[in-house]
């Protein structure tokens, strides 16, 4: 994928680097899978902030993506599109057996006209969705479901993938992009391949306004706050903190694990 670099005619374009999305379809193909989206901006049903640094953002609509496996399905890629709700691109697929259209996450190197399949007795091939019992060890997989009845929850961001490390009779172990190991059921499923838009992390927004378009608000340092707002706050003039780095709620942020992992597969 190529990049778009702009001439520095003003400060906001001096360091701007964006991805070239000219190959994507401009108009959504499946209008029935698109609905209006009400932005809650990191608030819960009481209006309280549960996720900080969220708010604003430009209006956009939600695309319904198929994150479930079809028992038997054969489809053809009809278009590649941009989705404002995620970093990866999406692909519209025409299901030959059910004679309808669905959206899926686009994979790297997946092209318009490619045939994809899902279900039992499916070949191990780019874009095909298989159960873990049919996937060979060492495969790069994405859109991972922990069990048959669940939707895909892991490796859905741009450029992410997991690796199938080990298989037993009922369970298998996968390594996520974060390096964490996860145990999932053999009845779960995954898609062969790496999620599209793998160069997304290289783009440079170059101005605060682009972050605000993406629903991102500024992140204020703890030492710049008052003592009531953060453990690092307060003091006359500028202070260096004078204590170990902690979260606004007092939990240590460095040199100490705050979670335990029992994902050991013997």
Predicted regions mapped to residue ranges:
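Glycine-rich active-site/cofactor-binding loop and its immediate structural neighborhood
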Residues: 87-95, 99-105
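Basic, glycine/proline-rich low-complexity segments that contact nucleic acids
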Residues: 1-86, 95, 108-266
